[in-house]
């Protein structure tokens, strides 16, 4: 599967590229450093999965995700960030990102990319633990996003 990595930390991008290219089924087409790069690279390559940081200079990953998904409704975007911030999680769900994992979970990145590529929505463990609380704050979600989130978390009901 073909992916693009976008992160403003060159060390993170380079490390992810090395790790992910060690898998025979993953090819890193390109790397970028901000949301503008993400949009341009996505339009150029149309990857199977876009792996992107949220907090970046110039244009953040959430804004870029929204713009990419507007132009490419089938885009599969997996957000990789240091922040398990409630507002970021809510915005990611509303934007239509297919996953949200923490950078501390490097060992799960390849499996998360594969899951997103296969049409699943992925949340890292720490994020997954927050979702029930976020869902209880119904007013923070519009109704369609609320339903989608319930659908995707229903498989993990034993963990709730």
Each model region followed by its residue ranges:
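Active-site residues of response regulator receiver
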Residues: 7, 53, 81
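Acidic catalytic/metal-coordinating carboxylates
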Residues: 34-37, 60-63
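Active-site beta3 strand of CheY-like receiver
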Residues: 45-51
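Receiver (REC) domain active-site loop signature in two-component systems and cognate sites
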Residues: 56
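Short amphipathic alpha-helix used as the core "switch/output" element in two-component signaling
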Residues: 62-74
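Short, flexible helix-to-coil linker/hinge segments that flank and couple to helix-turn-helix
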Residues: 87-93, 103-148
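Single conserved hydrophobic/aromatic residue that forms the stacking wall/gate
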Residues: 152-160
